[in-house]
């Protein structure tokens, strides 16, 4: 294999890197130096590290600048070690790098320091990503080190030892699909809140009848919201069917067959939709009105890569199921990875959000019988949701070579499978955690409090006037619409039978029952 690179030097002095401005003039190091030197066609890591010309450290959202004394040796080995030490694992960059660095050159790198922790980790990763064994001797009796640094990124709590490399494989996925999540202060703070325990406390303090009604409302609301996100307005029957599927999430193991079963439920009328894995290209976007050529916002994985990628998704779910990783940290990479792959012609978005419910339920994160209305929270945060989706899909557009087909589709011309196997899902976890927090701190307690207030109102009303439940619902609806007052129209029509004294008592009862409550949003209409 011929090594491709720009000149002899790896590092160079820059004020910006591939369109990303630097806080000051720096020398590239680690992944930036490797991407530049080997001309790797990869999405930039969310955060890069460089060497400042000054003796101070700078830490921003997209750059970590270290002092001159941290400058790595300007070699392949030097920048790889620097990357692992300061930038954690980026499997997409490493996979691309390993395609252009020969086995012979890489074997020499490992042989130069056979007992070194970084060399052993890189040796394992090289063989793990390429599927080819290197001609490298055993490192002898040395302490096994984790492949993924658990202080930098989330990995398996108990990894799998590799006696050949003297490392512990704690990667959350397999070479077929392995998105990673960095440990950030934001995620650590979200985990520390113990939102799952907060939800169980709310449920434990709620009467079973109230809880059953609240759970049913939240489940249906989530189902409707998931359709609304896709710009659809489902019939009541279709929303109920999908709500039932959401309620069963986590009860069956994942498989391609299970995804196809769920697709049939979510699509309903499949006369004009090809069910099952795509057999041609796919994209998200629009068409030029004059030429009908695609205007993609996101390009899906190639059809010939779908079987391997979906096997990877299933394997990831199995591998992390009892991995000791926080459930939300697992759910986001799985769900967003699925939607980037976009394996089906239709239904991908709703299945992607179903995967969130699947992961949380399988991990026991939500109380039994209660579904957090994550889709409803996403619908409220739709602009942020789209921004998170585009944080990875937009950079990919510049890396994917494609041409339009005669049917208005796209045909991808270059190799893209690794773009869907490996990506940084940190931003996705932070967003999903905000949505989960909303459902637990707002939706669930507000719905419970509202139903408890309604129960007080309904029970108290029977002491004023005998009224069937259907009429109580209508009276409550009118009072809610007018902030606790009955309109003249309702007073002279539907509730003309109420005396003035009864009406005064009814309005006072409504005020006493609902005073101080933050009322939940009205349910999305079907």
What label would you give each PLM region?
Residues 1-345, 350-526:
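FIC/Doc superfamily catalytic core
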């Amino acid at each position: 294999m011929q090594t491709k690179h720009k000149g002899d030097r790896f590092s160079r002095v820059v004020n910006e890197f591939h369109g990303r401005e630097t806080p000051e003039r720096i020398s590239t190091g680690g992944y930036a130096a490797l991407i530049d030197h080997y001309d790797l066609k990869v999405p930039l890591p969310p955060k890069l590290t460089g060497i400042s010309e000054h003796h101070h450290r700078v830490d921003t959202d997209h750059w970590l600048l270290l002092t001159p004394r941290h400058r790595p040796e300007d070699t392949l080995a030097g920048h790889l070690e620097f990357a692992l030490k300061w930038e954690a694992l980026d499997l997409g960059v490493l996979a691309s790098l390993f395609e252009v660095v020969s086995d012979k050159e890489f074997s020499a790198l490992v042989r130069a320091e056979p007992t070194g922790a970084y060399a052993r980790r890189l040796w394992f990763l090289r063989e793990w990503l390429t599927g080819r064994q290197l001609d490298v001797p055993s490192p002898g009796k040395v302490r096994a080190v984790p492949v993924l640094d658990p202080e930098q990124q989330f990995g398996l709590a108990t990894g799998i030892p590799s006696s050949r490399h003297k490392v512990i494989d704690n990667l959350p996925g397999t070479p077929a699909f392995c998105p990673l999540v960095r440990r950030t202060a934001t995620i650590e703070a979200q985990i520390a809140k113990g939102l799952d325990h907060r939800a169980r406390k709310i449920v434990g303090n709620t009467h079973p009848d109230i809880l059953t009604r609240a759970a049913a409302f939240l489940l249906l609301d989530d189902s409707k919201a998931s359709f609304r996100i896709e710009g659809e307005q489902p019939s009541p029957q279709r929303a109920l069917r999908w709500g039932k599927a959401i309620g069963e999430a986590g009860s069956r193991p994942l498989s391609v067959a299970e995804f196809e079963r769920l697709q049939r439920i979510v699509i309903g009328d499949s006369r004009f939709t090809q069910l099952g894995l795509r057999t041609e290209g796919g994209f998200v976007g629009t068409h030029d009105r004059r030429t009908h050529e695609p205007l993609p916002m996101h390009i899906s994985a190639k059809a010939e890569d779908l079987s391997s990628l979906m096997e990877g998704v299933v394997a990831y779910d199995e591998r992390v199921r009892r991995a000791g990783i926080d459930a939300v940290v697992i759910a986001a990479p799985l769900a967003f990875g699925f939607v980037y792959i976009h394996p089906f012609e239709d239904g991908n978005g709703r299945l992607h959000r179903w995967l969130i419910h699947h992961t949380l339920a399988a991990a026991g994160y939500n109380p039994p019988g209660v579904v957090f209305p994550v889709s409803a929270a996403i619908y409220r945060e739709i602009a942020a949701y789209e921004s998170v989706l585009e944080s990875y899909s937009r950079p990919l557009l510049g890396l994917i070579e494609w041409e339009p087909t005669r049917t208005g589709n796209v045909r991808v011309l270059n190799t893209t499978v690794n773009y869907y196997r490996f990506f940084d899902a940190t931003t996705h976890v932070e967003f999903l955690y905000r949505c989960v927090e909303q459902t637990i701190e707002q939706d669930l307690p507000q719905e419970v409090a509202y139903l408890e207030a309604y129960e007080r109102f309904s029970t108290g009303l029977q002491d004023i006037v005998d009224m069937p439940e259907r009429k109580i619902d209508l009276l409550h609806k009118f009072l809610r619409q007018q902030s606790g007052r009955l309109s003249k129209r309702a007073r002279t029509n539907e509730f003309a039978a109420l005396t003035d004294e009864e009406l005064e008592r009814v309005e006072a009862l409504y005020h006493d029952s609902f005073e101080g409550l933050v009322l939940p949003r009205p349910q999305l209409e079907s």
